[in-house]
Regions:
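Short, conserved alpha-helical segments within structured domains
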Residues: 44-48, 68, 139
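A short helix-loop-beta-strand connector motif used in the catalytic cores of GNAT acetyltransferases and
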Residues: 57-71
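Hydrophobic residues in alpha-helical segments
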Residues: 31-32, 41, 60-63
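A short hydrophobic/aromatic micro-motif that marks alpha-helical segments and, especially, helix-coil
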Residues: 48-50, 63, 166
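Conserved GNAT-fold acetyl-CoA-binding loop/helix
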Residues: 36-58
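Acyl-donor (CoA/ACP) binding surface of acyl/acetyltransferases
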Residues: 1-26, 30-36, 73-187
Length: 187
């Protein structure tokens, strides 16, 4: 795998780019403090803008050639509405595990599918990844629909794998797409 780091990517409606510190205000307003988003993520919503600012400062400092972390900016309004990133956990094996988060104001508009498609294209075509995978809590089937729309296939269920905010164990559902599947789907 070629390590190119977070490059600016563009789609019809979106700009995917590195996080800038001043993004924290939109992030806090649009998803980091959202009750609706909080239902479907494993982290706890941020009580203050300062918490989001601290996190973004840390993330900005972590950027290197093996960091793939994009802010999702909606072109029409020049506002950040979400994030999409790659865990470093399996990068040395050519496997990219992606995760994403989107403001609930933009759910069900195809935005996350558009962003994920572009990141998958970048990882396979420019970084030469072998496999791209993703996981989601079973209470978030919309995330699984995004994975299916971008060509990922259901791999299985990681039973009782993670605790939710109420300290209950939850299953994670796993999807992936292989390099050869991606290129075959493009034909």
């Amino acid at each position: 795998m070629k390590y190119l780091g977070t490059q600016t990517l563009e789609t019809k409606r979106l700009i995917l780019r590195k996080i800038k510190l001043n993004d924290y205000k939109d992030a806090f307003k649009n998803w980091c403090n959202s009750e609706n988003v909080d239902k479907y993520v494993i982290w706890t919503k941020h009580p203050t803008e300062e918490e989001t600012k601290i996190l973004y400062t840390k993330w900005i400092e972590e950027y290197d050639e093996k960091t793939y972390r994009w802010i999702i900016e909606l072109k029409d309004i020049n506002e950040v509405i979400g994030t999409i990133d790659v865990s470093k956990r399996f990068l040395n094996f050519g496997t990219c595990e992606i995760g994403y988060c989107l403001s609930d104001k933009y759910w069900n508009q195809g935005i996350m599918t558009e962003a994920t498609n572009e990141v998958i294209r970048f990882l396979f075509e420019e970084c030469d990844a072998d496999t791209i995978c993703a996981q989601f809590l079973e209470n978030n089937p919309a995330s699984g629909k995004v994975m299916e729309k971008v060509g990922m296939k259901y791999e299985g269920r990681l039973r009782s794998r993670i605790f939710d905010k109420d300290n209950n164990r939850n299953d994670l559902l796993v999807y992936s797409i292989l390099k050869e599947e991606y290129f075959n789907n493009k034909k």
